[in-house]
Amino acid sequence: PNKATIIYHHGTNENPPEMSFNKILAGKGTAVPANLIFVRAPFNSSLRAFVASIAQARNYAAMLATSAVLIEGLVRRCREQGQGPILISGISLGGFVANLHHTYFNSADAYAPLLAGPLIEDVFLNSVYRKLVAAPDAEAEGRITRALSFAAEYAAVSHHNLFPLLARHDQYIRYDVQRAAYGPNVPVAVLEKGHVTGALAHDALRAHLLAVLNAGLKQTT
């Protein structure tokens, strides 16, 4: 019961959804010293379902919120059962969910979002991902920002338990933008990779999570 727990959320349209979870945490030979819980978001059963979901910003926001609330339910259940420290992580989409939970609940002992930042709206408005989004004018862009932004709420939270990882050459989760958004007091680990190559760096991602388990959780408990 005193063993640490990692709650992990998948990335966008992983196929199968638990692919990165298995590669980083649960695969043969990974030997992660923690209880592992995998979370899958709505609208991610197929690429078609995901693309249809992001046609409306409110659907995407609902997906994020649903995952964050589900994770909070898992945190409470772990507490009720007397489990040890809880680390919340996820990659890309899952990293944004981790940041969202950190912002609105902050009930876990530590957070390690991978390849994600606090400004999810930037992905849709300013990165190469913009071509998938129909935002032809300032009014439409404003709707996306209002639906997805949680920057003000993030700024009001203590970040002593936040240990993110970014990829310096990421064209989706732009390093300079997201690094600045985390704030000067948040220690951000950096991979010298892009988004896809960073997501495939399973050993490096696992090493980061193990470092948070070994050092980060001790700092926050």
Describe the predicted segments one by one:
Residues A49-F50, I54-Q81:
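Alpha/beta-hydrolase active-site loop
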Residues G183-T221:
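C-terminal catalytic histidine-bearing segment of alpha/beta-hydrolase fold enzymes
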Residues V39-F43, A116, K193:
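Active-site loop/turn elements of alpha/beta-hydrolase fold enzymes
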Residues P1-A49:
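Short, surface-exposed "cap/lid" segments of acyl-processing enzymes
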Residues Y8, I88, P113, P164-L166:
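Structural beta-sheet core signal
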Residues S45-V51, I120-F124:
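Short acidic/His/Gly/Ser-rich catalytic and metal-binding motifs that mark active-site loops
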Residues E121-N185, A189:
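The feature captures the conserved acid-bearing segment of alpha/beta-hydrolase catalytic domains
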